[in-house]
């Protein structure tokens, strides 16, 4: 191939003295070239070396030849193009490339310039050979450039379409109308805006209707739509939203009502201190004792002590059965400690099961209407303040009943103090002394 190309070049450029038949004689020919064209010589100087290095790549001649012509036509081209394709062993063509370079210094080479068109055909023939080596990088370099815009153009429309589809799907699912998902988004947007534009009159009518019926039948819905100048769909959706809101409100209220319902059930118990007393007495194991005992206590003392019924107005209604009266006798003995209760004190012994609980629970027994803390504060306030006898009674009971300070509260029930104090003044020591051992035995 090289020889054929060389002979062709000699035939083409045979009229010129600088050409030689031997492809290796170009070294001598290149010497005049640098004087004529330094750029061409530079560009072609590197090529002959490459040509010597790789004579096998004859197929690359045509492209190199084309590059040389392009370099000659545009001076700026040679430095840029040769490095691109000059790196691979494309240089063997310089023998041919050299002849076209000289035409510039002499005028006659211009006619041969068209003749090089003949070698270009081989270039078209030879590129397949070069295709194995050179065109691949060029094509690879060009292919991404060509493919990237096309791929990008293909991707963007797909991405847009997918996003639109997703938007449509989401909007369709949100409105609950998947059937019209594709065309619905604009309609849905308008419908949503219309929903937010309900007038106060429309809202009032809708609220009234919802108050009577949470679910509308279709005839009523049509009627409402005609009355309110709304569509059935708007009314239906409004009722759906309103029902959801109602459910949320009911849940919140349910939590409050459940806690509130417990509180009222608890509230009646606290007003009657008996509930608190019951809890305390359950610990003392004197459940029957409860608040009921104080009211009977208040009743008999009225007869025995002549106390005014006004002192225990509240406990009286809460009083229940007479059995507390038996306990009352014990309570009276513990609380009043009067000589009249000496026999009742024996009754207290009879209430053996009651004795200790009374001592422990006496604070509760002190006042059905009064909580234990009140009874705790009560004894010193009433008993100690009114008479030393009551104080001594408290001391006697405290010593007599080591079971608990509860009996110390015993004088506390002396809220009917004045009478208690007067009565206790008559036989304070005897009654308490007699009661004390009995209580201790209990």
Swiss-Prot record:
Q: Pfam families, alphabetically?
A: DUF4074, Homeodomain
Q: Which SMART domains match?
A: HOX
The UniProt regions of compositional bias labelled Low complexity, in chain numbering, are 126-135, 300-309
Where along the sequence does the record place the motif called Antp-type hexapeptide? 155-160
Q: Tell whether DNA-binding is among the UniProt keywords.
A: yes
Residue ranges of the annotated DNA-binding region, renumbered to this chain? 191-250
UniProt keyword annotations, A-Z: Developmental protein, DNA-binding, Homeobox, Nucleus, Transcription, Transcription regulation
Which residue stretches belong to region Disordered? 73-147, 159-196, 247-310, 399-442
Q: Where is the composition biased (Pro residues)?
A: 79-125
**A GO CC annotation given for this chain:** nucleus
Note the superkingdom of the native organism.
Eukaryota
- Gene3D superfamilies in the cross-refs: Homeodomain-like
The primary site where this protein sits is nucleus
Q: Provide any one GO MF term from the record.
A: HMG box domain binding
The keyword Iron belongs to this UniProt entry's keyword annotation: no
Q: Which residues cross the membrane?
A: none
> What GO biological process terms are annotated to this protein in UniProt?
angiogenesis; animal organ formation; anterior/posterior pattern specification; blood vessel remodeling; cartilage development; embryonic skeletal system morphogenesis; gene expression; glossopharyngeal nerve morphogenesis
Similarity comment: family membership: Belongs to the Antp homeobox family.
This chain's function reads: Sequence-specific transcription factor which is part of a developmental regulatory system that provides cells with specific positional identities on the anterior-posterior axis.
> Mind telling me what this protein is named?
Homeobox protein Hox-A3
Q: What is the taxonomic lineage of the source species?
A: Eukaryota, Metazoa, Chordata, Craniata, Vertebrata
């Amino acid at each position: 191939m090289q020889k054929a190309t060389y002979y062709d070049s000699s035939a083409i450029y045979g009229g010129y003295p600088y050409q030689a038949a031997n492809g290796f004689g170009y070294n001598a020919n290149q010497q005049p070239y640098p004087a004529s064209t330094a750029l061409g010589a530079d560009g072609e100087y590197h090529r002959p070396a490459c040509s010597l290095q790789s004579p096998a790549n004859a197929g690359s001649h045509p492209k190199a030849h084309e590059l040389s012509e392009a370099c000659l036509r545009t001076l700026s081209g040679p430095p840029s193009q040769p490095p691109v394709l000059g790196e691979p062993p494309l240089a063997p063509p310089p023998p041919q490339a050299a002849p076209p370079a000289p035409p510039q210094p002499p005028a006659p080479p211009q006619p041969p310039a068209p003749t090089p068109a003949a070698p270009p055909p081989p270039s078209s023939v030879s590129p397949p050979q070069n295709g194995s080596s050179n065109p691949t990088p060029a094509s690879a370099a060009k292919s991404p450039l060509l493919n990237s815009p096309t791929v990008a153009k293909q991707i963007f429309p797909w991405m847009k379409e997918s996003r639109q589809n997703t938007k449509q799907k989401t909007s369709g699912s949100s409105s609950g109308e998947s059937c019209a998902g594709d065309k619905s988004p604009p309609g849905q947007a308008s419908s949503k805006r219309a929903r937010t534009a309900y007038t106060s009159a429309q809202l009032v009518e809708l609220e009234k209707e919802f108050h009577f019926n949470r679910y509308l039948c279709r005839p009523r819905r049509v009627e409402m739509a005609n009355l309110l100048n709304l569509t059935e769909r708007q009314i239906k959706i409004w009722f759906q939203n309103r029902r959801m809101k109602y459910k949320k409100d009911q849940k919140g209220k349910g939590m409050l009502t459940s806690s509130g319902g417990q509180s009222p059930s608890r509230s009646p118990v606290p007003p009657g201190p008996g509930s608190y007393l019951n809890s305390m007495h359950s610990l003392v194991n004197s459940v029957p004792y409860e608040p009921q005992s104080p009211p009977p206590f208040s009743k008999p003392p009225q007869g025995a002590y002549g106390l005014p019924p006004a002192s225990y107005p509240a406990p009286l209604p809460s009083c229940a059965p007479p059995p507390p009266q038996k306990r009352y006798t014990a309570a009276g003995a513990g609380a009043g400690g009067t000589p009249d209760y000496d026999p009742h004190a024996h009754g207290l012994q009879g209430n053996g099961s009651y004795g200790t609980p009374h001592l422990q629970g006496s604070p509760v027994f002190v006042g059905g209407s009064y909580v234990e803390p009140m009874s705790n504060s009560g004894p010193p306030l009433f008993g100690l303040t009114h008479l030393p006898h009551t104080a001594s009674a408290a001391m006697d009971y405290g010593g007599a009943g080591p079971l608990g300070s509860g009996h110390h509260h015993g004088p506390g029930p002396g809220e009917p103090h004045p009478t208690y104090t007067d009565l206790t003044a008559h036989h304070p020591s005897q009654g308490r002394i007699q009661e004390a051992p009995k209580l201790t035995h209990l």
